[in-house]
A protein has these predicted regions:
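Sec-dependent signal peptide recognition
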Residues: 4-10
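C-terminal motif of bacterial Sec signal peptides marking the signal peptidase cleavage site
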Residues: 16-18
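N-terminal mature-domain "stem" immediately C-terminal to a signal peptide or N-terminal signal-anchor/transmembrane
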Residues: 20-91
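Extracytoplasmic/secreted envelope proteins and their assembly/folding machinery
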Residues: 37, 41, 112-115, 229-236, ...
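Sec-exported extracytoplasmic/periplasmic mature domains
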Residues: 45, 64, 119-123, 236-244, ...
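Acidic/His-rich structured neighborhood in mature extracellular/periplasmic domains
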Residues: 83-256, 331-335
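Acidic/His/Gly-enriched intrinsically disordered linker/tail segments
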Residues: 226-293
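C-terminal soluble interaction/assembly domains
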Residues: 276-347
């Protein structure tokens, strides 16, 4: 028994070491980042709704730049009756969120570390002045994607704030996520399995990457779009070097291993069966869109959204061939140039 325990411990040590064995992780310990967290979620759901006028006025004094956009744009209400209705409907969701996020320090610490890497690579970039945890409506995954240029993220950036939508991070086994209505109308199980705290920093960094280098790939052909998305993933990897790739990609560990083991076959299939320069929306959705798997590949092992992963590998190859380029220069390189100079030929 002792030998078995020792063996398990050794495997654990090796696994942990392998996650932190990257040579390209810079030392950011001297970079000062302190994020201000203002608990809008608590202020809103702990207000006295019997005196709604007074409560809303107090909230508006405390959050003058945020309350109106939250109510009108995010929640979609314009009067006190609508506010009360939203309050009653989502108060149980808020109560559930407090069991996990009453202490927000673990999330704050994750974000501060990520922003240290952001500041290392982009010293002039200023993190949001305040982090605002919220509990908002359970919009559909399609609505969320429209808000984020095609990428699902429930979070949002304002002029001086970053909103974290806690209703989408209550744990994959949260009872509401398992209901038929939620699965069919909000997020299927392959997506809600990522509704965990560990994914918050990765999904926030998607917003930051897009804030730094807005994704303009919507009208591009397939291969260029894959590479543009891959550039975003490459940059997120720079911001989260200590985070496992399964978190950054949203793939399961099994799906990630399948990609790594079949990289050459994936690329061969795509160049053989697809026009890399097509703008056909169905083809693009096959490789860029969310899904339980990618059509044409293993339903048991392949992930959806496979195109950005291939794009990421192409960008990594290009970056390795161009060590003189800084991250900002790589991000500003056209996908055509990246494809040409990467000389991507996986085995």
């Amino acid at each position: 028994m002792a030998m078995k325990k020792s063996g398990l411990l050794l495997l654990l040590v090796i696994a942990v070491a392998s996650c932190n064995n990257r040579k390209d992780i810079p030392d950011v310990s001297d970079i000062k980042v302190i994020l201000a967290v203002n608990r809008f979620d608590q202020a809103f759901f702990e207000m006295d709704t019997t005196g709604i006028d007074k409560s809303i006025n107090e909230l508006n004094r405390k959050y003058p730049e945020f309350l109106a956009p939250f109510l009108q744009t995010i929640v979609g209400v314009n009067d006190h009756a609508g506010i009360k209705s939203f309050f009653r409907l989502y108060k149980p969701i808020f109560d559930s969120s407090q069991k996990i996020y009453k202490n927000f320090d673990p999330v704050k610490n994750d974000l501060e570390q990520a922003f240290r890497y952001v500041k290392f690579y982009f010293p002039s970039y200023n993190p949001p002045a305040q982090i605002l945890p919220v509990v908002g409506p359970m919009n559909s995954i399609e609505d969320m994607a429209k808000m984020a240029n095609g990428d699902f993220t429930p979070n949002f950036i304002g002029p001086d704030f970053l909103g974290i939508s806690l209703q989408f991070y209550l744990g994959k086994d949260f009872s509401l996520y398992k209901t038929e209505y939620f699965i069919n109308n909000v997020a299927p199980l392959y997506r809600s399995r990522r509704f965990e705290r560990e994914y918050i920093a990765a999904e926030v960094m998607k917003l930051i990457a897009d804030d730094l280098f807005p994704d303009k790939s919507n009208t591009m052909p397939l291969i260029e779009r894959m590479i543009e998305k891959g550039k975003q993933w490459w940059l997120i990897d720079k911001f989260l070097p200590e985070t496992h790739d399964s978190i950054k990609t949203g793939y399961t560990q099994k799906q990630l291993e399948w990609c790594e083991e079949n990289e050459g076959l994936i690329w061969s299939y795509i160049i053989k069966n697809e026009n890399l320069h097509t703008v056909d929306p169905v083809t693009i959705q096959t490789y860029i869109g969310e899904g339980p798997f990618t059509q044409g590949f293993s339903q048991e092992s392949s992930p959806g959204n496979l195109g950005p992963w291939i794009g990421w590998q192409i960008v990594k190859k290009f970056a390795a061939n161009s060590p003189e380029l800084k991250p900002g220069e790589i991000m500003n390189t056209s996908p055509k140039q990246i494809l040409e100079q990467a000389k991507y030929k996986p085995k």
